[in-house]
Amino acid sequence: MKKNSNFLIVISSILLVFIFSISVINSNNATETSASSISEKRIGWGIKRSNNNEQPDLGSINKKIIDTYEGIAMGNKYSKYVYLTFDNGYEAGYTAKILAVLKENQVPATFFITAHYLNTASDLVKQMIDEGHTIGNHTVNHKSMPDLTNEQIQKEVMDLHTAVYQKFNYEMKYIRPPKGEYSERTVAYTNTLGYKTVMWSFAYDDWDKNKQGREDYGKKMILNNIHPRSSYITTCNFKR
């Protein structure tokens, strides 16, 4: 009777080991399949503008990736808010005035900064934080993320993250891919670093130095394309 009992224990142990091994194999296969199904295709963010101040068409691929990874491009069409965002790669002498206007009108904004901006305009970054604005990650060197490995992306993102935290005790949570270029892989990976991707639903050519200083044109473009829960992108590097 004792021999039979020992035999059953041995058989049961073997079965448990077998079942556990199969579970681990299946789990690994599922992880590999999931990782391999993430697209590496480079995408340049773009939108199709709508008329009558309606929300634009983000495009099916853009929308799917943003929704899947809980990013932000625009909000609920029934909410009358806008997201005001600025990309700050370098300082051209206009940010202080922009901050003054925002403060005067009690308007919060988000500024996406690079390491160069942090190192050369840290006083303005401090002012942004002190006045209640959000600071976002625009990476260390403003490189196109689809060109980078995950390890390189981690360095580009987290080196800046650490520098901002050490300098201001401020933890960034939002990232804007440099040049508006991304892939599903890069968005998925930056998610694992604790970041939400922020894109936009309105932009115009304010970055072109040859087209700057056109106040009437700028107002017309903005007012004609404003829509509920719009996400505006502009820069602090041109004369308005």
Over which residues does each language-model region extend?
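Second-shell loop/turn segments in exported
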Residues: 84-85, 89, 113-114, 142-151, ...
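Acidic (Asp/Glu)-rich catalytic clusters
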Residues: 75, 98-106, 118-138, 190-192, ...
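Loop/helix-junction capping segments adjacent to catalytic residues or to phosphate/diphosphate-binding pockets
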Residues: 92-93, 118-122, 147, 184, ...
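Generic structural signal for well-ordered alpha-helices
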Residues: 69-70, 99, 122-126, 157-161, ...
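N-terminal pre-catalytic segment of deacetylase/amide-hydrolase enzymes
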Residues: 2-85, 91-104
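Structural recognition of the beta-strand scaffold that forms the well-ordered cores
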Residues: 82-85, 109-113, 134-137, 173-177, ...
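Hydrophobic packing within well-folded, soluble alpha/beta domains
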Residues: 111, 128, 135-138, 153, ...
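Alpha-helical scaffold elements lining the catalytic groove of polysaccharide deacetylases
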Residues: 94, 143-170, 181-228
